[in-house]
């Protein structure tokens, strides 16, 4: 209802309307939908850094179906021009240096509490693709294929969602992680150039 009202006001004033919605941050959904950190903790019960980092597992097919339906319902509103994806990424495995003092952190490595997603499905899919059991690796941050796997999960979901929204004649915009592409890949597993 809020998107409908705001989009109508925007159009009356000659503006485009981008319906901004956080993508991967949600509360109150089935526990099996949440990403799992390297310690085996689900993001609905233990969050890295801040309580709102209740991050969904972007590789979970039920999560994908839920989000696609949610975005399509908003895109179906006649006066919505764009759906805008925010938090279309994993939580920060490394926080930006400017935030270290705020949280009393020294981020000199990828810490298990902030490193997602180690759910059974992601681990099994990665092992099937690479032969690597990522849970048995002493330092998963050194396995570039593991970081790339998670980047690909985000990219593949965005492409799937965009195809659905574009088929409705609507557009998609996104809030992407700031800074060089290499920081987005390293810190939040997002390849916004793809």
Label each residue range with its predicted role.
Residues 57, 133-153:
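Surface-exposed cleft-lining segments at the edges of enzyme active sites
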Residues 67, 74, 83-86, 165:
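Conserved, mostly hydrophobic/aromatic
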Residues 3, 8, 18-78, 135-139:
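Active-site-adjacent "subsite" loops/lids of carbohydrate-active enzymes
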Residues 33, 80, 84-142, 181, ...:
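Active-site-proximal loop/short-helix segments
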Residues 22-24, 90, 179:
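Residue-level marker for beta-strand->alpha-helix junctions and adjacent short loops that shape enzyme
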Residues 17-19, 83-86, 172-174:
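Hydrophobic faces of well-ordered beta-strands that scaffold small-molecule active sites
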Residues 93, 171-194:
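Substrate-binding cleft/loops of secretory-pathway carbohydrate-active enzymes
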């Amino acid at each position: 209802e809020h998107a409908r009202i705001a989009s109508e006001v925007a159009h009356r004033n000659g503006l485009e309307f981008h319906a901004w919605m956080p993508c991967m941050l949600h509360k109150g959904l089935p526990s099996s939908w949440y990403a799992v950190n390297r310690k085996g903790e689900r993001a609905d019960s233990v969050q890295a850094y801040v309580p709102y980092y209740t991050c969904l597992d972007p590789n979970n097919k039920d999560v994908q179906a839920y989000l696609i339906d949610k975005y399509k319902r908003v895109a179906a509103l006649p006066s919505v021009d764009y759906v805008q994806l925010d938090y279309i990424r994993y939580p920060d495995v490394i926080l930006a240096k400017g935030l270290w003092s705020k949280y009393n952190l020294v981020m000199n490595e990828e810490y298990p509490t902030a490193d997602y997603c180690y759910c059974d499905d992601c681990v099994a899919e990665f092992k099937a693709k690479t032969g690597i059991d990522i849970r048995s690796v002493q330092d998963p941050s050194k396995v570039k294929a593991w970081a790339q796997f998670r980047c690909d999960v985000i990219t593949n979901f965005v492409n799937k969602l965009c195809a659905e929204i574009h088929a409705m004649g609507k557009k998609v915009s996104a809030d992407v992680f700031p800074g060089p592409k290499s920081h987005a890949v390293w810190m939040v597993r997002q390849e916004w150039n793809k």
